[in-house]
């Protein structure tokens, strides 16, 4: 009987997925946990079942699932997000080198969406906004500008950025999403923003989070991200920007401006993701820290010129 149970669990896609989700949760990658759980629930609704065998996840099954999502009125971005999460789970469960997977030809791209970047003139308008010192709007503006100055650093990495990650004139941290080590030389513009919060008696650089460990920290981060995006909408109106700011816009803005200033594409790839993660990794490995520092210095001088 025990052997039968073990065989059943081994063949259960849902059971294996839960094992992976538990492992990811133990690594405190709560956003990934949320994505995996949401995608898995969606798949089970399509299958009208509480469990699925690994063998039942075929290319036809995945194709049918994506068609079902479309008929449910789910956006292409969400379909892509669900599919990427399920593919990641499947690959961890059933990965075999050189073997095609049911997700090989599934849609996992990014359709054309609303404009995701702003111009240098918009950044200058933000910089010139007169805001009350110590206000939440002033903090949100500082964070947005800081993200831009730091190669489009994601909000989550800024929120959790610790003072001990700054030393010898450089910010060194690991991206929470990819675990890649990032090294950012501290230019004068970056130093100025950090200095505004140097008196805060806390381990984090910015007074954004009140919780820093475990599930509570993730919940706090989600609340603060929502507040931050609300503040960015307010700042957009105050600065009379034609494009509404969002937290996700910073990295695209850095990449777009860098490209316009003839920064090499392989350098820009460190700020923008690729459809193929392997391609991104190849580009990242080829980036010299000095190249990156010089590219960022040129860009910051261009944006902050009077």
What are these regions (language model features)?
Residues 187-242:
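Active-site/catalytic core of tyrosine-dependent DNA strand-transfer enzymes
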Residues 183-188, 196-197, 285-306:
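DNA/chromatin major-groove-contacting recognition/catalytic segments
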Residues 164-172, 241-243, 263-284, 306:
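Short, polar N-cap/turn motifs at the start of nucleic acid-interacting alpha helices
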Residues 103-155:
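Basic, Lys/Arg- and aromatic-enriched nucleic-acid-binding interface segment
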Residues 117, 175-179, 272-297:
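Catalytic-site neighborhood detector that most strongly recognizes the C-terminal catalytic loop/helix
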Residues 42, 71-104, 153:
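N-terminal DNA-binding recognition helix of tyrosine site-specific recombinases/integrases
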Residues 2-72:
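Basic/aromatic-enriched alpha-helical hairpins
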């Amino acid at each position: 009987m025990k052997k039968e149970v073990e065989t059943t669990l081994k063949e259960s896609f849902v059971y294996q997925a839960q094992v992976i989700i538990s492992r990811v949760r133990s690594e405190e990658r709560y956003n990934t946990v949320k994505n995996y759980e949401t995608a898995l629930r969606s798949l089970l609704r399509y299958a009208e079942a509480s469990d699925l065998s690994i063998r039942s996840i075929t290319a036809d099954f995945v194709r049918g699932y994506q068609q079902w999502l479309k008929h449910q009125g789910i956006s292409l971005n969400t379909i892509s997000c669900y599919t990427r999460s399920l593919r990641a789970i499947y690959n961890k469960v059933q990965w075999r080198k050189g073997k095609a997977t049911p997700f090989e030809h599934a849609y996992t791209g990014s359709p054309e969406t609303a404009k995701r970047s702003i111009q240098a003139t918009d950044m200058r308008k933000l910089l010139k906004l007169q805001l009350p010192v110590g206000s939440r709007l002033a903090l949100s503006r500082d964070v947005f500008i800081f993200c831009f100055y730091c190669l489009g650093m994601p909000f989550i990495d800024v929120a959790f950025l610790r003072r001990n990650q700054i030393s010898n004139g450089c910010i060194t941290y690991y991206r929470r999403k990819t675990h890649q080590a990032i090294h950012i030389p501290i230019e004068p513009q970056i130093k100025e923003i950090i200095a505004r919060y140097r008196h805060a008696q806390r381990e984090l650089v910015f007074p954004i989070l009140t919780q820093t460990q475990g599930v509570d920290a993730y919940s706090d981060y989600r609340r603060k991200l929502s507040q931050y995006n609300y503040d960015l909408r307010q700042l957009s109106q105050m600065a009379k920007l034609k494009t509404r700011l969002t937290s996700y816009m910073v990295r695209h803005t850095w990449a777009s401006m860098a490209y316009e200033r003839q920064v090499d594409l392989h350098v820009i790839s460190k700020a923008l993701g690729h459809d193929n993660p392997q391609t991104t990794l190849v580009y990242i490995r080829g980036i010299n820290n000095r190249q990156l520092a010089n590219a960022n210095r040129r860009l910051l001088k261009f944006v902050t010129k009077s």
